[in-house]
């Protein structure tokens, strides 16, 4: 949708949905446009409202009015199980990241090939804010491609 208006608006920065699973940023041509024009990009939902972290064991029962009730992946037990499996694989591959392995991986994988990018993290509590403060260790291209392959296959 952003690409439809990008030449009219001519922004300095855009804020698309992008994470290891939702890749329209790449497939729409927006990533190429950002790179070609050296624009800033701030990724919205880099952990897809938490579902990509593998922290859920079952279909969550969000309270009425919680927007996550409308996100299909939260209602898909097969998807939830795959995210748990991905988390275990990541924690096994990156023991040096400790308890931050999943966040380092999810964010590092979307930032590695996007030099003008940042991510918007919605910290809901003190612990999440503390984790965010510890992030930022770079990953190799090979590690990032491995992480992406977990979520895109």
Segments the model singles out, each with a brief description of its role:
Residues 1-153:
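Beta/alpha (TIM)-barrel catalytic core signal, keyed to glycine-rich beta->alpha loops juxtaposed to Asp/Glu
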């Amino acid at each position: 949708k952003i690409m439809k208006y990008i030449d009219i608006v001519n922004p300095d920065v855009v804020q698309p949905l992008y994470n290891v699973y939702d890749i329209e940023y790449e497939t729409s041509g927006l990533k190429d446009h950002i790179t070609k024009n050296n624009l800033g990009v701030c990724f919205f939902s880099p952990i897809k409202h938490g579902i990509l972290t593998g922290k859920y064991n079952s279909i969550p029962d969000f309270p009425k009015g919680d927007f996550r009730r409308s996100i299909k992946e939260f209602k898909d037990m097969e998807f939830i199980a795959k995210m748990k499996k991905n988390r275990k694989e990541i924690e096994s591959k990156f023991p040096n990241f400790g308890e931050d392995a999943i966040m380092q991986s999810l964010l590092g994988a979307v930032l590695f090939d996007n030099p003008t990018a940042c991510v918007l993290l919605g910290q809901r509590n003190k612990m999440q804010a503390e984790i965010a403060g510890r992030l930022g260790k770079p990953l190799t291209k090979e590690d990032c491609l491995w992480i992406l392959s977990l979520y895109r296959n």
